[in-house]
């Protein structure tokens, strides 16, 4: 026998469910069956833990919005605010994936079977920027959007049958 030590975690570590402030360590574009995506890796986490955000387009305007929202909420590649042809305010940004590196986001970790994953719905980090700024209220709003999405996914997930038994047949060896 020997004297040993072990960690004494209280459940609030780097893998606990909930919100985590993440720093993007690497980002690159990819393609899956003709759909573009950006994959993100984070400082302090293994390369096997990543976030993949797929492009999505508005059915009426055909404008891509999912990757654009990633750049906007990460405050990455933001150049300026401009007026769109329709007169609405628009954000001009550079979509080079390297612009995401070093940026901080709030990511929501959730349990998916045996694994922890990060939601593709992120929230910004409160900060004052040259073009875009996010307040604590903005962060709270985007976190609420994500939490509502996660709750909806859990509610719509197929039910898993409970195969445990507490009856007398539980002691039958066959």
Question: Model-derived features: where do they sit?
Answer:
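Short beta-rich binding modules
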Residues: 1-174
């Amino acid at each position: 026998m020997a004297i040993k030590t072990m960690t004494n975690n209280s459940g609030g570590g780097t893998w606990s469910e909930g919100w985590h402030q993440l720093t993007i360590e690497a980002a690159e574009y990819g393609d899956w069956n003709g759909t573009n995506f950006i994959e993100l890796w984070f400082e302090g986490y293994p390369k096997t833990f990543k976030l993949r955000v797929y492009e999505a387009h508005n059915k009426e305007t055909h404008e891509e919005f999912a990757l654009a929202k990633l750049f906007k909420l990460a405050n990455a590649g933001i150049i300026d605010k401009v007026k769109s042809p329709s007169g609405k305010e628009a954000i001009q940004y550079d979509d080079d994936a390297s612009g995401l590196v070093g940026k901080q986001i709030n990511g929501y970790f959730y349990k998916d079977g045996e694994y922890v994953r990060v939601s593709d719905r992120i929230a910004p980090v409160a900060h004052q920027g040259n073009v875009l700024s996010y307040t604590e209220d903005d962060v709270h709003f985007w976190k609420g959007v994500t939490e509502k999405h996660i709750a909806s996914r859990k509610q719509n997930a197929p039910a898993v049958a409970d195969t445990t038994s507490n009856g007398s047949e539980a002691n039958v060896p066959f």
